Amino acid sequence: MKAFYGMLVIFILCSTCYISVDSQIDTNVKCSGSSKCVKICIDRYNTRGAKCINGRCTCYP
C-alpha cells in the first residue's frame, strides 16, 4: 500500500511539472527585465504572469 501512495505522489508531481511547462507562452519580444514583459503579456494574452528569460518575454496564463 505504501508503494501505491509513493507512485501516486510521483505521478502527481510529474503531471504538474508537465502541465506547467506546457502552459508557458514564449514570445519573440526582446526584454531586459521582467517588468518590461508584463504589459506585453497583458495586451497579447490577458495575463500578468510574465518573466524575461534569455532576453525574451515568456507569459504564464
Swiss-Prot record:
Changing D43K: Increase in blocking A-type potassium currents (IC(50)=96 nM). Decrease in blocking A-type potassium currents (IC(50)=335 nM). Decrease in blocking A-type potassium currents (IC(50)=235 nM). Gene3D superfamilies: Knottin, scorpion toxin-like. InterPro entries: Scorpion_toxin-like_sf, Scorpion_toxinS_K_inh. The modification Pyrrolidone carboxylic acid is found at Q24. The record marks K51 as: Basic residue of the functional dyad. GO terms for cellular component: extracellular region. Pfam families: Toxin_2. The keyword Signal applies. It is found in: Secreted. Keywords: Disulfide bond, Ion channel impairing toxin, Neurotoxin, Potassium channel impairing toxin, Pyrrolidone carboxylic acid, Secreted, Signal, Toxin, Voltage-gated potassium channel impairing toxin. The record marks Y60 as: Aromatic residue of the functional dyad. GO terms for molecular function: potassium channel inhibitor activity; toxin activity. SUPFAM superfamilies: Scorpion toxin-like. GO terms for biological process: envenomation resulting in negative regulation of voltage-gated potassium channel activity in another organism; venom-mediated suppression of platelet aggregation. Disulfide bonds join C31-C52, C37-C57, C41-C59. Expressed by the venom gland. PROSITE patterns: SCORP_SHORT_TOXIN. Irreversibly blocks the A-type voltage-gated potassium channels in rat cerebellum granular cells (190 nM induce 50% inhibitory effect) (IC(50)=190 nM). Also weakly inhibits Kv1.2/KCNA2 and Kv1.3/KCNA3. Negative results: does not block ERG1/Kv11.1/KCNH2 currents. Belongs to the short scorpion toxin superfamily. Potassium channel inhibitor family. Alpha-KTx 15 subfamily. This is Potassium channel toxin alpha-KTx 15.6. It comes from Tityus discrepans. The lineage of its organism: Eukaryota, Metazoa, Ecdysozoa, Arthropoda, Chelicerata.
